[in-house]
């Protein structure tokens, strides 16, 4: 299956099929120097499958975890690109989850003012969301995605076979992003996630439908000037929770926690039940006082306020300018 992201000169395909990694040479332009970036939590054969099809390559394996999305790791990748004598005709390939894609994409965006970038996501979260859209970033001083750029990939290669290696927790994390898109854009997708007798068997359809939503939103708003902010549903509180939790919670788990307060009170029990069905947390110990400093540093904030995404009915959304204090009031009242 091919899903196109139509952005004029920056258009690219999302190639979605079982066994796609074994056919990477057919789909990606790899007859050049390629820095293949992965992490220690990804089976090494995935990166090798890409590297073996390159004219010249170097695999850079980072420690797994958000801690690698740092300035130090960014500098490491740039140095590896220099050692490989890469020029503007060469490329970077990210093989891994969201951390790898964000970091490798940012290195590609800034090395020699930009080189080609291929995203080969190996987690469900990255497959349904972060691999598409060109957002790249690193964290700085505990602030998530504080430094970044928009840099669209040349292609996204999704091999659904790799999902077999994920833990139940990693699968649940990815489902959080699909729930986010369903809540804001597709009520029937929400019903599928809510009622499917076998969520694992339904994953290919969930991935494809999530990607179509993401592609349509990115096409209309590639640099997040308006509509694309809908994809931040759950993320304003979610990023604050992620920073507050200090690595104990995964990104998708924090998004799940951040969605419930931002939907209408009558909808919260249904959303909570869906998240629990997916294996996601719906409670954590972060207090409003602990979350406030991180909300104040939210990159989406302007003049002391944030444009928050709210959901009153599944498949719909509205945006409202809110202060951090107003958002935290929703956090405190989420179970009311």
What are these regions (language model features)?
Residues 103-114, 244-248, 264-265:
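Alpha-helix C-terminal capping segments
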Residues 83, 152-155, 161-168, 176-188, ...:
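Generic secondary-structure signature for well-ordered alpha-helical cores
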Residues 1-91:
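ATP/NTP phosphate-donor binding region
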Residues 99-106, 127-128, 239-240:
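Short glycine/serine/threonine-rich phosphate/pyrophosphate-binding segments
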Residues 15, 29, 106-196:
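A glycine/threonine-rich phosphate-anchoring loop and its flanking beta-alpha core
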Residues 176-178, 267-336:
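C-terminal charged capping/lid subdomain of soluble metabolic enzymes
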Residues 192-290:
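Active-site segments that bind and position negatively charged phosphate/pyrophosphate groups
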Residues 17, 36, 70, 121, ...:
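Residue-level signal for inorganic ion chemistry
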């Amino acid at each position: 299956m091919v899903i196109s992201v139509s952005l004029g000169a920056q258009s690219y395909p999302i190639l979605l099929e079982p066994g796609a990694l074994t056919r990477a040479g057919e789909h990606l332009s790899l007859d050049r120097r390629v820095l293949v970036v992965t992490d220690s939590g990804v089976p090494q054969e995935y990166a090798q499958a890409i590297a073996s099809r390159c004219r010249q390559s170097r695999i850079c394996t980072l420690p797994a975890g958000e801690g690698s999305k740092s300035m130090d790791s960014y500098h490491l990748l740039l140095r590896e690109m220099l050692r490989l004598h890469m020029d503007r005709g060469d490329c970077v390939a990210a093989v891994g989850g969201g951390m790898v894609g964000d970091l490798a994409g940012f290195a590609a965006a800034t090395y020699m003012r930009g080189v080609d970038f291929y995203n080969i996501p190996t987690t469900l979260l990255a497959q349904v969301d972060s691999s598409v859209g060109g957002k790249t970033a690193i964290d700085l001083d505990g602030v998530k995605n504080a430094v970044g750029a928009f840099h669209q990939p040349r292609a996204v290669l999704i091999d659904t076979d790799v999902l077999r290696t994920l833990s139940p927790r990693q699968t649940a994390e990815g489902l959080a992003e699909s729930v986010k898109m369903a809540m804001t854009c597709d009520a029937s997708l929400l019903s599928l996630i809510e009622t499917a007798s076998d969520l694992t068997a339904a994953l290919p359809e969930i991935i494809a439908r999530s990607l179509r939503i993401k592609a349509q939103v990115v096409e209309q708003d590639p640099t997040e000037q308006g509509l694309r902010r809908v994809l931040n549903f759950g993320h304003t509180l979610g990023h604050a929770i992620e920073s507050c939790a200090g690595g104990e919670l995964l990104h998708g788990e924090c998004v799940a926690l951040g969605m419930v307060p931002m939907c209408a009170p009558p909808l919260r029990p249904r959303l909570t039940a869906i998240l629990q069905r997916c294996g996601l947390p719906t409670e954590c110990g972060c207090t409003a006082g602990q979350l406030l400093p991180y909300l104040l540093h939210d990159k989406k904030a302007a003049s002391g306020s944030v444009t928050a995404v709210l959901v009153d009915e599944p498949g719909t959304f509205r945006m409202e300018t809110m202060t951090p204090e107003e958002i935290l009031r929703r956090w405190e009242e989420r179970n009311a």
